[in-house]
Amino acid sequence: KSISESRNKKSLFAEFNKNVNGNFDIRFASRYEKIGSSSSFDPKISFKYSLNDSLVFRASAGSSFAAPSMAQLFASEILLGTIRGADFSDKARVIQIGNPNLKPATANNSNIGMIWKLHSNSKLTLDYWTIDYKNRIELENGSVKASLEADSQDIIRNDEGYIVGVHTSFFNEEQSKVNGIDTSFETYYDFKELGSLRYKIQGTSFLDYLTPDKDTGSMVNRVGYYNYNAHMHSIPKYKINSFLTWEKMQTKVNLITRYISGYKNKTPITSSHAALGYTDKVDDSMMVDIGVEQYFQANAYNMVLGINAINIFDKKAPRLYNAPDFSFDPNVHDARGRLINLSIQLNF
């Protein structure tokens, strides 16, 4: 159906920065935002203390505000897919509609960390962070809704009892608590006529991702699970990316690795599917990309030619038992295999 809606947005931002005694920085920032009938004032304070030339400590705390988008409020969309019912799986239409009663999402954020300069060309960072959400906006999962609310009027069945449609919408999750650790290491070497080498590795570890259980209301840690029975995606505990770049003159070579840790799948597995090799675990994933860029200059033009091989070893996405699809987790992994990209960039 056609929808005609509008709203006004106003915002005001201020920031104050002060250096104390040469080695201590304090910054205060604030933002006032009014979107439609909702408004919020969100302050943030951050500190940075240089213990010496090598070691820096940092911390921050603040709040944030996110109004629902116009699509989340009013849009409608029909998708065709597979639905896991309470006892069987069906092809069905998923009717996704907006929710005009959504509240803005708010959060309190904080972090504490350090920067350690090992020497002039290398540094290590480590940060612990936490986010406490209120009214975080989520989209109902059609399969989860059909399984947990089999008798709901939003589950449309034909005369034979098979699911032919599911109405889903956006909703405010009352509370979510997320915390984790980010770390990175980077270094740089100049080999003169042999070129330069830059290496960086960065990782994230989720410690907790707590959301309410639909039945009991108690907070459940979703880290390390496929979360088939919740209106949310999988949360692998670790994600680690590394970047190695060699550069000489007009040539650059990049080598990238992307690691995602495995996670458990509590979806009940039938004995027949277990016999086919399906398990209650989604395996780790490691993908490797490589790319080469060559720079050219012709008159007043600069040109960059590039070739990139994504997932150069053609690794398959880890197998997931998710009847009726029996394939992979599209929210985490890419099943397209090896991709070759050619690019031309012209600057003038």
Language-model regions, residue ranges each:
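Transmembrane beta-strands of outer-membrane beta-barrel pores
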Residues: 30-36, 61-67, 76, 110, ...
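Repeated loop/turn-to-beta-strand initiation elements of outer-membrane beta-barrel proteins
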Residues: 23-26, 53-57, 120-124, 192-197, ...
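C-terminal beta-signal and adjacent terminal beta-strands/loops
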Residues: 207-208, 258-271, 292-348
